[in-house]
Amino acid sequence: MNVFKNFEQKIKKSLKESDIKGKNGENLDLSKITVDPPRDSLHGDLSTNASMVLAKSVGLNPRTLAEKIIALLKDDPSIDHLEVAGSGFINIKLTKSFWHDVLKLMITSGTDYGRTQIGQGKQVNVEYVSANPTGPMHVGHCRGAVVGDVLANLLQFAGYNVTKEYYINDAGKQIEILAASVLLRYREALGETINKIPEGLYPGEYLIPLGQSLVQEFGDKLLTMDNEKALSIVKERSIDAMMTMIRQDLATLNIHHDVFFSERMLYMNNAQAIRNTINDLTLNGYVYKGKLSPPKGQTLEDWEPHEQTLFRSTDVGDDQDRVLIKSDGSYTYFAADVAYFRDKFHRHFDEMIYVLGADHAGYVKRLEAVAKAISGNKAKLTAFLCQLVKLFRNGHPVRMSKREGSFITLRDVVKEVGRDPVRFMMLYRKCEAPLDFDLEKVTEQSKDNPIFYVQYAHARCHSVFRQAQENLQIENPSNDLMIAHLDQLTNDSEISLIHKLAQYPRIIEQAIVYKEPHRLAFYLYDLASNFHGHWNKGNDNPELRFIKPNNKKLSLARLGLVQAFINVLSSGLKIVEVKAPTEMR
């Protein structure tokens, strides 16, 4: 149950049924009404902007309108107190019995508390990672991989039918470079001395085993084989080997895609998928023959001073028209991207989400233009960028050089610090902001390490139940909690904890609506901080401790509160795909 959404609906229902109308007697637009936690908990449990957003259309001062809205709500048995604050916000204080009922729901719902059906079974495609199959995943890929995976998990938790997709860029120039690099390692495996990797080829030693495997399979036959045939074999083996490596890298983070879509599929049957796409765009008036103006002070992809086949993307929001077919008749990378989107659209997804790296900033507008043109404005597309990850060790930058092949792989990082710190900390900044990842800090056992602090809160919760079994002789906590007298929880600190727990369904919905999975990581840390804070209060004041050996009734009520923490922390950590330990030493 989303307490905030429920009260928003209550307020809207009360207004609809009231005599409060627009200045000309019209019904009010209630869509901008929100209910949120107040900035200061001393101001109440909920705060609504209802009078602020309606005052102009009603023709009343916001504070005057607020008093009228308060009159509509004052008889609600779950409300303890209402007041007008500032220029017209309404603060709402709820009864303790209301919060006890919410806590009961948290206990009985288990880890399903916070689960919603706002997705209503809608089909959503989340494409993420989609790294070129030219080498192992490096630390820079971690962020988009985790963000995409957790966003997909959030959507599934909220009732969406999600497809996790990886687009394999296996038809471009980088594959030619990969094949040439592997052929060099093949010759090396046959005994040829390679003193230096030529400029422009991939220098990484990860290609050495691939060269050796080609020798085991073909001996020296590739050297005497028709060059085109040999190159085709090397490309095939190289792509397969790189994708196997990438899948294994992602598996270390427990990331598993449902679909791996090969770009080469678009070029099958004489590029039929691309030709069909261009035909569709042509029929709808989006394709023409022409010349693009030369770039001013910047490099324009695929620019040439000859007539080309162009996509009229400026008609659908792009900054400039885009080349589909070059003057020599070859298709651009962009043409394949358009065909790929068309394929997704024909798979009947209600929404398509792209999680992209920061280097794709210029790609978003053209992608949005493609979506409008292909779908006739029917497709819902969301694309967002993940900024760079900067790697540190104890505050000092870790130097990497892709040119020299000396980069830190995803697998290296997971092996050193573990999967959980990587997954959690990759969420611990907004995507738009660069993220600093310190290999030492993420394994510290301190409050300054968010993943430790959250997992430690979960483990502490379980330790409370172990204490209860020792001190209260509780044999079956689940049964005892079902009959716990939650009205024993009257301390403001305890009620405040219930407030914080009750924000979980709201956080889930916001993370989905705004496509911001970092909100979940932030919330889990705040929730853990609240729990640890209450634990520390119990150290200073024995009356606040969870277990009171001489008062089983109160102890059971407090155990109910602890169980709610276990449920919410377990649920959130499961979405993030991080372990929820029951014990930490």
UniProtKB/Swiss-Prot annotation:
GO molecular function: arginine-tRNA ligase activity; ATP binding
SUPFAM superfamilies recorded: Anticodon-binding domain of a subclass of class I aminoacyl-tRNA synthetases, Arginyl-tRNA synthetase (ArgRS), N-terminal 'additional' domain, Nucleotidylyl transferase
Membrane spanning residue stretches: none
CC annotations in GO: cytoplasm
Keywords: Aminoacyl-tRNA synthetase, ATP-binding, Cytoplasm, Ligase, Nucleotide-binding, Protein biosynthesis
CDD domains listed in its UniProt record: ArgRS_core (cd00671)
Subcellular localization: Cytoplasm
Coiled-coil annotated residue ranges, if any: none
EC main group: ligase
Catalytically driven reaction(s): tRNA(Arg) + L-arginine + ATP = L-arginyl-tRNA(Arg) + AMP + diphosphate
Motif 'HIGH' region, residue numbers: 131-141
EC number: 6.1.1.19
Gene3D superfamilies: Arginyl tRNA synthetase N-terminal domain, HUPs, Isoleucyl-tRNA Synthetase, Domain 1
Protein family according to the UniProt entry: Belongs to the class-I aminoacyl-tRNA synthetase family.
Name the UniProt record assigns to this protein: Arginine--tRNA ligase
Lineage summary: Bacteria, Pseudomonadati, Pseudomonadota, Alphaproteobacteria, Hyphomicrobiales
Gene this protein is translated from: argS
